[in-house]
């Protein structure tokens, strides 16, 4: 498959994940206008307060509608544009007063195709046991690990991982245990032929033991078993080498634009 096709699958999956998990947040709002989507919450994490171009033929008015909605809520937010595909909207954001962020300005969107069975086999260290979450105790463990691993406030995990997701088709939540203690989290989100890999976080005391790679491989393997032949994710620069060893390659780069006048979360 051409990288442009993989980029489309990555983008569709990310939006499906974002708009899906924020249903766990009571004050979340997902609005669509003119081919753009605004995902807005009270959570202090910009993934869940952002505007994205969703459709071909998106309009400047649609993007600005999302920006206006975000400004009305008053929380910090970002707009992420795909380099190349969304370049036409840079001028729109500039006129609206948004600026490219200096810190963490880009996010690589990555895809693995075809999924290499050798790359994802035999990845779990012997002391790690990965379990699919089926109850509230598992949700609590997932939230605990995600909060510790990402260094975020507890409400972020609480607002994006909840019991209702356990009944959602295509969504699987995971926790990995070592010595009976939760040490690594993960979440898989399926859209068509793509399995999205999300919420890979390892607690500090369990890092550099291959647990994050093992969780990623498990999500990919379960996706293959469900009929997927493409895996997608959004990487940090720190995590990119780990994902590349599992067969992922960058297919799109997102550039982040922020609103200088938006207030900061307290």
Predicted regions and their residues:
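Conserved GNAT acetyl-CoA-binding A-motif
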Residues: 73-83, 223-235
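Terminal substrate-recognition subdomain of acyl/acetyltransferases
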Residues: 25, 110-123, 178, 189, ...
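Acyl-donor-binding surface of acyltransferase catalytic domains
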Residues: 56-137, 151, 257-259
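A structural microfeature
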Residues: 102, 182-184, 252
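Conserved acetyl-CoA-binding loop-helix of GNAT-fold acetyltransferases
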Residues: 60-67, 198-204, 208-221, 225, ...
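Conserved active-site alpha-helix within GNAT-family acetyltransferase domains
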Residues: 86-100, 213, 237-253
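N-terminal charged segments
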Residues: 1-73, 85
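A conserved beta-strand-loop-helix scaffold within acyl/acetyltransferase catalytic domains
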Residues: 154-205
